[in-house]
Amino acid sequence: MVVSSPSVSLLHSPVEKLSAQLEKTTLLQDIPPGSLSENDNSTTFIKPPLETASSSTPIPSSSSSGVLNPSSVRGKPVACLFVASLNSSRSEEELTATVKDYFQQWGPLLHVKVLKDWLQRPYSFVQFQNTDDASKALSEAQNTILDGRHIRIERAKVNRTIRISSAPHQPYITKKDIDNLLEPYGEVEDVTEIPDQSAFLVRFVYRDEAIAAYTALKHSAWPVLWAENVTYQNGHYKKKGSSPFSPPNAHSRRRKSQGKDQSNTPVIKAPAPIPFSVSSDPPSTMGRSNSAVQSPSYFAHSLVNSTEFSTPNESLSSLPSILPSIPSLESGKAELPTDGSFEQPGYPMNPSMMFAAMPPPIDPYSIFVGQLDPVNCTHYLLVDLFSKYGKVIDCKIIHQSKKPAFAFLRFDSQQAAYAAVCGKTRSPHQKKPLRVEFRQLRPMQQFSPQYQYPSYPYPMFPAPFSPPRNAMMPIPAPMDQFSTFHQSMATLPPGAVPTSIPQSYYPIYSPEMAMPQSYSPMYYTHNPPMDGN
């Protein structure tokens, strides 16, 4: 099936061409399901969620869930506080009520959530309606007594920043290009330029808008990465957590005290650590995991991750292509400034990508639903609850002994799965709020290459000594009786293997040697001794 697209021959700006490709994706939204065959070369695209991610989401009233002010106002992440050291002897309902009554004195609240970690220690997230009220509560309620315990308060770590850089051999991207590129996806809180890398750090107001922008632009002409909430000021990176909104940590106070005691001692400054870590893949909206760094750009498959209050962690496979490649962009080397405006950064430019953690893959058609009541939750109730977002074609419920059940649901479209993840799904039959996120797949679950490689992770080799993929493939059968192969020798892709090898030729490489990715084995001649010599 062929879908006509606007001509890009008269467009001169890379952003205009990318906008034309974005318009092309909207033409596929009216195609009925099933009209695209498996052999069709066209791609199913996700329309940028203009209303779902940026519009106000009404919050239903529910005393058990801690919602205090049912209105259409969306709570900003900067107005959300993390409260720890709560009394573990009280139930979640009692803690929700006490935390609600305690923090209402600083301002109106939108909701309060009480959760427990793996050690059954309770903690809470308090969402204020106003940022000033949250800042005031953070400074005044710190280390105060609630239910007989000194509580600890921090700013909730809601990561919502992406990094956009200039494409190779393309003109430098400008702030105007960033504004035009990200305008459809939601409100941007801050745009910070990184002059020494020709890139921008873009922090959205809401996390789901950052995920929507990353997902839609991942396969565009601009390299897009997931980043931490940082700012770039006076040539230095500054994490968002070190702003006046959050209290200083003990490490900074210890460094200050040590500096006073050793003021006469010369200090040797070591290179600063990497200011922020990025990931080549986005998270889903509700998961929980740790930080991740960028995966190598030369990997054969793109990888994707997710967290609710942090950056993604584990390795994941790619989503379907969101945007087609744009081969018609002008090719040309970008001009470097000659006025000396480029200063050498005071930190290592990039960590070794060979040891970079990779975020996990997600299935854009399926969702994970956690914290289900094992007694009241049934297959019929779960399908009926999520059918408002789209047609549910599969549902599997997994019951655990003495633990909440969980389920996997598969929709007939990506838009339905995205709406289910972003929606505030609540059930009257559930005692706890549901945990809804995209289904995470195993690292190699979506990979089906022509040649299966062993599951050796690349980080097991140092960066300068990483063997190519063709050095870890199955051992081939001898091509003739005179050919001898090293035990770790692997077959080469079709077309790279010679039809015949001269007799008495041997390969001379092994996986321990340093070889480029496009390595072709070399041979040397070995003359066997003649009989009688």
Swiss-Prot record:
Residues 36-45, 277-292 have a biased composition (Polar residues). GO terms for biological process: negative regulation of conjugation with cellular fusion; negative regulation of gene expression. Keywords: Cytoplasm, Repeat, Repressor, RNA-binding, Transcription, Transcription regulation. Residues 54-68 have a biased composition (Low complexity). Pfam families: RRM_1. One of its GO terms (cellular component) is cytosol. Its main location: cytoplasm. One of its GO terms (molecular function) is mRNA binding. It is found in: Cytoplasm. Residues 79-158, 365-441 form the RRM domain. The keyword NADP does not apply. Residues 30-68, 237-292 are annotated as: Disordered. The keyword Hydrolase does not apply. Negative regulator of sexual differentiation. Acts by repressing the transcription of meiosis-inducing, ste11-regulated genes. This is Multicopy suppressor of sporulation protein msa1. The gene is msa1.
